[in-house]
């Protein structure tokens, strides 16, 4: 009674550092991004899809839309159940990571522009989610637990995304987070986005 072809999640719970080449379609990667319940595999397929979008040549076949829609669908539930994984799924690989996958004709300015462009698209595609997500991650007394570390990590990412998308009031969130921080992670996260986005109070 299987009505559609199954999508294979490979090397689940496999601890050895293995690189396996498998011909995933973009739709397969997006499906696993949304529904995979193995955290590492979910992160890995997300990185595979992002790298495919960023590193494709002029004959571009991978559309950012399938990635953006998958993240938008997966993020609310994941933010509530595993904040650290949610934060990591919003990561866009840094330019040096992307460079390691390019074996010829490396153009650092082009790679940088493509990365920043996808980050901007992601921030704007989920613009309506950032305010609610930030409210769901309230600042509390410092706690050194996996859940608390995940909350802090996701809050910093959401704050940067909100500022990137010009969400109303996000500059005030940054100032409040800086003023009320209970640890260096919160304070530095707020200061970093204030400087990167050239907020008026960044030098205060």
PLM region descriptions:
Residues 2-204:
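Long, ordered, helix-rich scaffold segments
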């Amino acid at each position: 009674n299987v009505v559609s072809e199954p999508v294979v999640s490979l090397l689940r719970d496999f601890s050895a550092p293995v690189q396996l080449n498998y011909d995933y379609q973009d739709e397969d990667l997006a499906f696993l991004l949304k529904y995979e319940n193995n955290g590492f595999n979910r992160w890995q397929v997300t990185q595979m899809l992002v790298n495919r979008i960023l590193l494709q040549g002029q004959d571009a076949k991978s559309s950012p839309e399938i990635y953006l829609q998958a993240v938008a669908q997966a993020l609310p539930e994941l933010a509530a159940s595993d904040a650290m994984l949610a934060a990591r799924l919003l990561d866009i690989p840094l330019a040096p990571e992307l460079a390691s996958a390019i074996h010829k004709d490396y153009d650092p300015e082009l790679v940088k522009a493509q990365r920043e462009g996808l980050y901007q698209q992601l921030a704007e595609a989920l613009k309506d989610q950032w305010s609610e997500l930030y409210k769901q991650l309230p600042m509390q007394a410092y706690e050194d637990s996996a859940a608390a570390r995940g909350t802090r990590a996701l809050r910093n990412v959401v704050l940067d995304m909100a500022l990137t998308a010009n969400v109303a009031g996000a500059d005030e969130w940054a100032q409040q987070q800086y003023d009320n921080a209970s640890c260096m992670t919160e304070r530095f996260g707020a200061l970093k986005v204030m400087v990167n986005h050239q907020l008026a109070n960044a030098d205060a």
